[in-house]
């Protein structure tokens, strides 16, 4: 599965449009180039939809969100939906502010997402949004210690991810010490990460960009593509 999905990516060299944060934009661009994809970053509302129309995947990341980015994300997402282009959302720190919560709620309402890549605290925050519950505690953009996906908590996190995937009709990629990838029916658990990955900024953002590329290159096997991206990243 991994070798096939990666071979498809390198053969097709998909163009990935990322509306992403300025902390990790260069890292994401270089990672896409390294894996065989082609990056383009365009966040101005006047061109975002046009760029998406020429791309093979759309990666939306709210890490450095501002009010100008929201219409760009919505316009690009609508264009992607109209053209059948996969859309991945990385809801960075969604529980940290009302702007982030409101933006993610609007994106979930107005766009058809292919996948959401998030840590456990972000997934829980989205689940609360979908249930119209008050926002819970936040650790900024990091997962709270009690939310980390460990072997001991694996079952409850698989259940959470599967329920959200089924409700939203998209793939949920819940990342942490153990990574969970699910479409609501089947769940894949991946154990090849390393504790040092939590000591740098941008690993999640890079994985989101990489996953968008894998989804673009493997349109008929999205779950396998998402799992392959996580395996590749570690």
What are these model-predicted stretches?
Residues 20, 68, 95-96, 152-153:
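Residues that cap or flank secondary-structure elements
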Residues 99-187:
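Conserved phosphate/ATP/ADP-binding segment of small-molecule kinases
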């Amino acid at each position: 599965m991994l070798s096939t999905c990666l071979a498809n990516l390198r053969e097709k060299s998909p163009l990935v449009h990322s509306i992403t944060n300025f902390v990790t934009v260069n890292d994401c661009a270089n990672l896409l180039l390294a894996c065989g994809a082609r990056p383009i970053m365009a966040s101005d509302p006047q061109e975002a939809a046009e760029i998406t129309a020429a791309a093979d995947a759309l990666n939306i990341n709210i890490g450095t969100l501002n009010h100008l980015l929201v219409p760009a994300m919505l316009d690009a997402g609508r264009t992607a939906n109209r053209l059948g282009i996969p859309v991945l959302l990385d809801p960075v720190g969604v529980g940290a502010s009302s702007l982030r919560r409101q933006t993610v709620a609007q994106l979930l309402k107005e766009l058809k997402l292919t996948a959401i890549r998030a840590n456990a605290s972000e997934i829980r925050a989205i689940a609360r949004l979908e249930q119209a519950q008050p926002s819970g505690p936040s650790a900024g953009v990091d997962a709270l210690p009690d939310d980390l996906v460990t072997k001991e908590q694996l079952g409850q996190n698989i259940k959470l991810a599967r329920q959200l995937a089924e409700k939203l009709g998209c793939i949920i990629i819940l990342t942490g010490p153990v990574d969970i990838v699910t479409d609501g029916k089947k769940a894949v658990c991946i154990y090849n990460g390393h504790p040092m990955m939590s000591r740098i900024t941008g690993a999640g953002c890079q994985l989101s960009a990489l996953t968008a590329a894998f989804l673009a290159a493997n349109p008929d096997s999205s779950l396998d593509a998402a799992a392959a991206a996580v395996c590749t990243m570690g």
